[in-house]
């Protein structure tokens, strides 16, 4: 039964004779129905029933075969008979859908081939073909299922199809999937289900670690939506918390019990601080999830991550890693801290989202980058919302002031801004008040801005991983997006990993790119050591002549101050000699 056929019934008007005859027949039928109370009452009931069938995404409601009515005579009986026939067809369709479930390993191989999934490990569980499988295979909680429906999650993405059954089987896992592929939901759904099932203990059971506050806040919002109206034993609601500065203080001062929350989401340093102050005990944590794992295990966070692991002392602790990029060194670390993990790769490990149109634009020098942005605006290619990434706070500020002169609706976000300022800017950008957001890599990971049309890498990213995460702010949730990377003569080495990502993502690569994309061992080592990074000039469109005059004037003022200072010192010495 097509829902649109129900809603548009009787709205067709045609010009030929047959259609006129049909139209008049419809009107006569309508007049006849008006004289029959039973017929008029059965039609809305039938339509309502058909609508319910169409909206029953997960087939968790039993659709009645007959419309309950005290009187069904004449035409009403024909309608019920027709309805029963359509219901039989629907049930036949349902049986076809049920037969498409993942039952055998051969079914799993076909499904994985469709989305280029690579799963390895011992005793790998079968993936789910639909959310319906969660009901039949795992006795999925109805309240959690309703929250999924209310938030318009109707079909699992590839990473969700693989991750959810693995985590529900309580296995350690390393998962890599493109940006915007639904990784957050892939670990939230099984985590919530496991906490609902675990009725033995009270207190903190799930811990989610994120490298940035913005990503942690986003995970908290999504988790709160799915945990809405879910109650555990003794009518206690499932509690989710974001470890903010305020909550840390309350835990430290014992205003709030540490056993109040079932799930806590936090950045590494804040969590370690609270644990060291003995305000929070991680001994009961059974599920530890690292989102953006490659960042959490690099040299910036690895010591903090190690402290978190040592604080989680439960012998049955399950560890999970998610990211859009998983370097080999992170996988090596994972193998040492995990127990027989399953490895899930969707697509290519170092590839970007295939929905993103990636381009490289040669700008000659730093001044050429500003000209290139203004060219995009003039040609109508600068389609908001737009995110521009730079390598440093100083350069982000400088570009912000330059674009303000162009009267663009723009703002800048970086680590020097307060959390309140950052939250307000992000909210304005999401609501459409801001058209362009300039930022550093603080926003490159995880944060979900729906509908971003364009990402501009004003400065070439320092690694292929950074590039994948930056451009991953667009092309999310199945939408298309565009990413442009500016480069100069100085970036000849730094763009090689980016060209390789473009090739692996299926982008068209010109001949000159093919020639320079291959890297020697020495070049790879120099990039790892950061030698590919170049010192960049200040962002400015002020002419060189004006800059020279300003510099000369500044030097003259400084020289004048020195002369005055030396004269005053000489006068003081002369006065001392006379006395």
Swiss-Prot record:
InterPro entries listed in its UniProt record: DDX52/Rok1_DEADc (IPR044764), DEAD/DEAH_box_helicase_dom (IPR011545), DEAD_box_RNA_helicase (IPR050079), Helicase_ATP-bd (IPR014001), Helicase_C-like (IPR001650), P-loop_NTPase (IPR027417), RNA-helicase_DEAD-box_CS (IPR000629), RNA_helicase_DEAD_Q_motif (IPR014014)
GO cellular component: cytosol; nucleolus
Region feature Disordered, mapped onto this chain: 1-99, 520-579
Localization of this protein: Nucleus, Nucleolus
Catalytic reaction annotation: ATP + H2O = ADP + phosphate + H(+)
Chain intervals with Basic and acidic residues compositional bias: 45-59, 520-538
Motif (DEAD box): 291-294
Short name of any one Pfam family annotated for the protein: Helicase_C
Record-listed E.C. numbers: 3.6.4.13
Record-linked CDD domains: DEADc_DDX52 (cd17957), SF2_C_DEAD (cd18787)
Residue stretches of biased makeup (Acidic residues): 76-97, 569-579
Helicase C-terminal domain ranges (all copies): 355-517
Gene3D superfamilies: P-loop containing nucleotide triphosphate hydrolases
Function text: ATP-dependent RNA helicase involved in 40S ribosomal subunit biogenesis. Required for the processing and cleavage of 35S pre-rRNA at sites A0, A1, and A2, leading to mature 18S rRNA.
Family recorded in the similarity comment: Belongs to the DEAD box helicase family. DDX52/ROK1 subfamily.
Stated name of the protein: ATP-dependent RNA helicase ROK1
Source organism of this protein record: Kluyveromyces lactis (strain ATCC 8585 / CBS 2359 / DSM 70799 / NBRC 1267 / NRRL Y-1140 / WM37) (Yeast)
Lineage of the species this protein comes from: Eukaryota, Fungi, Dikarya, Ascomycota, Saccharomycotina
